[in-house]
């Protein structure tokens, strides 16, 4: 039975804007209050999905969430008609309006942590929705994310859905952005690598400038929920010093595929025992770990963050080599591009690079890896997935036409209070649920 890594990319929402909501994400802060183009953002994402599908990779689409999140505003004490609520919140709390209008669910690497059937004791694929409780604008995503995943992976024989962990600091969970899987074929047992920023109970090393969003306790809880064998799980601490330089998730400083771990020299807390444990566990599944460590002398942490070199997709090719999917910013950084040029000619596993323009997402701090949720599936499981979300030439055309019909080509903060934007969004999402055969996944569809 064949195995695949299926990438489910988030479709950028209609309220995509630059509000600087994500403290610790330097691109988000740098582009605060600049003009956004939601239509272009959505099309840039769709082009990447289509290009990878055309190369033969399994590619799915995850829909955006309803924004502004009117239910959240009502929960926070705003009342009256939708028009009255928007008018009041823009006057009394403009930052709150921006937060409940964020299109951040596009970064589906934070949607959930996923464990394949080959790794779980019950032989099923497990999903735990991330609580994202470090940032309010992201913490409000969990319920709709859960509804979306349950609609797409809707077969209890193959898929298990867990609620988000308790939304408290001790169990801060950022999903797959702090999770890697190392092994061989995708349908064979592998080692799951959970990367955390701090320990809630024991304390220890922590960043001082920016928050460590993922806790060890959260990672351990997810491993338990997913029924993982402790001998096939490793918990690694991210280097607090790089968090303080803008590495707010591990996928900004490392990426893996099969038996290859591509990471910066300073990505993790130096601990030879952890790497020895990882190599030992890899040996038990008859796999040899291949690490590609990028020296700080060639690419600094600052250059890695500004270029998003590691916020890339590492994909297996038919010839046994690997393709690295990078944002245009990596090509534009001389040190990074020089390193990559050497890398693909070094005889190692990575022999090709593909560059994508994702600038609208990148200005908010989200590159190729942020935009996708990896789900390893076998043939039977893939057949059980809602096929309407899988990228095809016909779906690409349908979604592009949908974007052209519904998305604005410029958006400023003042537009978020426009009741017409809310109605445009609801009409668009209602139509999208029909295109993707998702059912009623949005709150407004239950009014």
Curated annotation (Swiss-Prot):
It comes from the Bacteria. Catalyzes the hydrolysis of N(2)-succinylarginine into N(2)-succinylornithine, ammonia and CO(2). GO terms for biological process: arginine catabolic process to glutamate; arginine catabolic process to succinate. GO terms for molecular function: N-succinylarginine dihydrolase activity. The active site is at residues 174, 249, 370. InterPro entries: AstB_sf, SuccinylArg_d-Hdrlase_AstB. Belongs to the succinylarginine dihydrolase family. Pathway: Amino-acid degradation; L-arginine degradation via AST pathway; L-glutamate and succinate from L-arginine: step 2/5. Keywords: Arginine metabolism, Hydrolase. Substrate binds at residues 19-28, 110, 137-138, 213, 251, 364. It is an enzyme of class 3 (hydrolase). It catalyses: N(2)-succinyl-L-arginine + 2 H2O + 2 H(+) = N(2)-succinyl-L-ornithine + 2 NH4(+) + CO2. It comes from Yersinia enterocolitica serotype O:8 / biotype 1B (strain NCTC 13174 / 8081). Its EC number is 3.5.3.23. Pfam families: AstB. This is N-succinylarginine dihydrolase. Homodimer.
